[in-house]
Amino acid sequence: MIYPKIPLAQSIIEICNTKGLHHIVISPGSRNAPLTIGFTNNPVFTCYSIADERCAAFFALGIAQQLKKPVALVCTSGSALLNYYPAFAEAFYSQIPLVVISADRPQSKIDIGDGQTIRQENVFANHSLYNANLVENVSEENDAKIQEAIHLATTKKGPVHINVPFEEPLYETVDTISVNTKIIDFDTENKPLENLDVFVNRWNDAKKKLILIGGCDPNVIQQFIIDFLANDTSVVVMTEVTSNVHHANFITNIDAIITPFTDDDFTNFQPEILITMGGMIVSKRIKAFLRKYKPQQHWHIDELRAYDTFGSLTKHFEVLPSVFFKEFIPKINSLESNYLPYSLEIKKVRTQKTNTYLATIPFSDFKAFEIILPKLPLYSQLQISNSSAIRYAQLFSIHSSIEVFCNRGTSGIDGSTSTAIGAAIASGKETILITGDISFLYDSNALWNNYIPENFKIILLNNGGGGIFRILPGHKENETFNTYFETSHRLTAKYLAKMYNFGYEKAVDEKTLAEKLKITINTKKSIILEVFTPTKVNDLVLLNYFKNLT
C-alpha cells in the first residue's frame, strides 16, 4: 500500500481508520496532498472529490446527516478553508458531526507574505466543538488532539476543526508506515435522569399541555411516545414537517391553526406546560404566539442542547425523549380536559376551509405544492430548500413513510442542493429535492459532482425571483424591491441540466405539472423538473389563503 512520507499525515490517516471515520470528502489542492495520497490509496476509505469547497462541505453534511456518523472534509491552505464555514455553522446548529481537516503551512510561514496563506488556527472558533491546532512533528499530544476532536464530533454531534501544518516536499510516498499511534479509549458519559416527582405533579395539575416538535431524525420520537401523547385530552401536539412524527390527532399545519386566532383564542390556547423536542422551529407564528402568551413551564428534552426560544425555558432534560418518557409515562395520571377536543375541532374547520380554497386558486406555488406532495414516492426521502419552499411544505401533510429533511440550523439557502445529493448517496433512497429558483441557482455548483446517483431528482419551483419577499411586510412593487430583494430574473435550469447530464422536464400549469411529475417520478435517472409559476400571483394566493381561514 502507498502511504504519504510525512509522518503526521500517516498518524491522521491511521487514527481516522481506527476511529471509524471512513467517509472522506476531498477538495483538490497541493498543501493537502499528503492526506489525499493517504486516504485515496487505502481501500477502507470511501473518498469523494468535490472541487468547490462550499459545495463539498454541504455534500459532506448530507452524508453525515444520513449516516449519523462523522464525515471528514479535507482541503488545502488559504481561503479554501473559509468556504467550509456555511456548512460548518449549519452542522453546529443542526447537531451534525463533521471533521474538518485543513492543511496549512508551518507556523513560521504565517504572516510573512507567503502565498495562499491565512491565519487558519481557530478560524471556526465561534461554532466549533473543538479546535485541534497540530504541530509539524509526530507527537502523542498531536495524536490525542486528533482523537479528542473525532470523539467530540461523534458524541456531541457537531463540527470540529483539525489544522495540520505540512512543509514541502508534499508528494513523496513510502511503502510502509513509520508511526506507532497511541489509541485512546474514551469513556462515554450518559447523564442519568433525575427524580421526576416534581414534574409529574406539575403535569398532573395542568389541563393544557402543548408539545411542539421541531426537526427530528426519523424514529427519534418512538411510537409509544406518540401513542401516549395522542390520547391525552389535556395534550395538544404540534409537529413541523421536518419532525418526521405523524398521528391523526396531531396538528401539522401550525400556521393555518393559529394565524386566524383572536386575542381570546390565543388566551384559550395558551398552555400551562410547554414541552419541546427536536431542532429549530420553522413557524414564525408559533414563536410569536409562545413569546407573547408564555407557558408557566417550558421543558426541553434533548441530550445536548436547549435553546430558550420563547423566553420561558424552566427545565432542560438532558436525555433522549425515549429515556424521559419511559420513566415519565407510568407516573402520570390521565386528566379530562377540553384542550385537545377544542384544538381538533379547529383543525377540522381549518382543513375544510383549506380544501375549499385550494379548489378555487389559480396555478401558483401553493397549487404546485398541493399537486406535488401527494405524488411523492412512498418510503422516499424529501429534502426541502429554505425560504418559501419549506414554508409551503409546512402547510400540507406528508405521508408518514416519507422522511423529510431541511437545513434549518442556520436556515440558509446556500447549500440545499449539495446537502440533498450527499443525503441521496448515503441513504440509497429515492431522494427528491424541492427547491426554489434562487436557492437552486445559488448552489448550482452542486451539480458539478461525479457522484450524483440515479435516485436523485430535483423539483425546481421557478417564480422568477425570491418570492418570499413578496409576502413580507416590506414588499413594494418598485425597482429597488425587484433588484435588491426579490432579485428578479429570467433564468432557467434547462441548460444546466444539459451540461451536467440531468434529464429535464418543464411544467407551466396544472395539466403539464401532473404529466411531467409522473414522468419525473418514474424516470430511472437524475432529472430536473422545472415548474414555472407566476411571480405576481403567488403572494396574493398565499396571503388570501390565510384571510380565508377566518
UniProtKB/Swiss-Prot annotation:
Keywords: Magnesium, Manganese, Menaquinone biosynthesis, Metal-binding, Thiamine pyrophosphate, Transferase. Binds 1 thiamine pyrophosphate per subunit. Its cofactor is Mg(2+); Mn(2+); thiamine diphosphate. It catalyses: isochorismate + 2-oxoglutarate + H(+) = 5-enolpyruvoyl-6-hydroxy-2-succinyl-cyclohex-3-ene-1-carboxylate + CO2. Signal peptide: none annotated. It comes from the Bacteria. Pathway: Quinol/quinone metabolism; 1,4-dihydroxy-2-naphthoate biosynthesis; 1,4-dihydroxy-2-naphthoate from chorismate: step 2/7; Quinol/quinone metabolism; menaquinone biosynthesis. The keyword Protein biosynthesis does not apply. It holds the Pfam family TPP_enzyme_C. Its EC number is 2.2.1.9. One of its GO terms (biological process) is menaquinone biosynthetic process. InterPro entries: MenaQ_synth_MenD, THDP-binding, Thiamin_PyroP_enz_TPP-bd_dom, TPP_enzyme_TPP-bd. The keyword Hydrolase does not apply. HAMAP family: MenD. Homodimer. Catalyzes the thiamine diphosphate-dependent decarboxylation of 2-oxoglutarate and the subsequent addition of the resulting succinic semialdehyde-thiamine pyrophosphate anion to isochorismate to yield 2-succinyl-5-enolpyruvyl-6-hydroxy-3-cyclohexene-1-carboxylate (SEPHCHC). NCBIfam families: menD. This is 2-succinyl-5-enolpyruvyl-6-hydroxy-3-cyclohexene-1-carboxylate synthase. It comes from Flavobacterium psychrophilum (strain ATCC 49511 / DSM 21280 / CIP 103535 / JIP02/86).
